[in-house]
């Protein structure tokens, strides 16, 4: 595969810089990520984040009607607590701050540390964990967050934009997350910038059912079916 990259180590930061350059009226760069270029004071702020490589998430989700800021880690790696703190401080609008992310150990640790630091400064900061991946655990609240991030964060952001208070927004997040389920199938692994081999491989004619977005093991491999058969697998697998 042919790729156009500079130094692979700089890929995430250059991707963010390019996005900001393309949309300077909407995005402002800060340490660790981006925030909205225009401020709306006295509203609950929503900051989303996670590892880079899931484009357009997470920086591409910042703007009117969506997130107030995004924390962008290295490729498939959790942002640091200091990055999360810096973006959250820049995004805070004085009415409480919500930090939304998929349920992954590194994100839980680092975003949690940032929230603790913000609370010590008098900011009502709370973490929102998306848990939609039915392949990852039997208990809904222990599952990973995958494609469900998008609808869950969008509805949550709309509640923030309406001027709901932080308790109302959290209640809406809980309802939407509780009603969101995802299941993925993989046909091939991606090749990360600077790597020579794919992150994982799936045998020709097979599909990996339930594989995670970073190549985490799924439920099983099975024969690749037709579009209708794959759709039925995704829609009717029990959670």
Residue spans for each PLM region:
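Gly/Ser/Thr-rich loops at beta-strand to alpha-helix junctions
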Residues: 51-56, 102-110, 145-149
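Gly-rich Lys/Arg/Thr-decorated short loops/hinges at beta-loop-alpha junctions or inter-strand turns
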Residues: 42-49, 58-71, 136, 207-223
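Short Gly/Thr/Asp-enriched flexible loops that form oxyanion-binding sites at enzyme active sites
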Residues: 108-121
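N-terminal amphipathic/basic leader segments beginning at the initiator methionine
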Residues: 1-46
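Internal, active-site/partner-interface "lid" segment
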Residues: 136-143, 153-214
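Glycine-rich oxoanion-binding loops at beta->alpha junctions
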Residues: 54, 61-93
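Short, acidic/small-residue loops that bind anionic groups at enzyme active sites
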Residues: 70-75, 119-142
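Conserved small/polar residues in nucleotide/adenosyl-binding loops
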Residues: 236-239
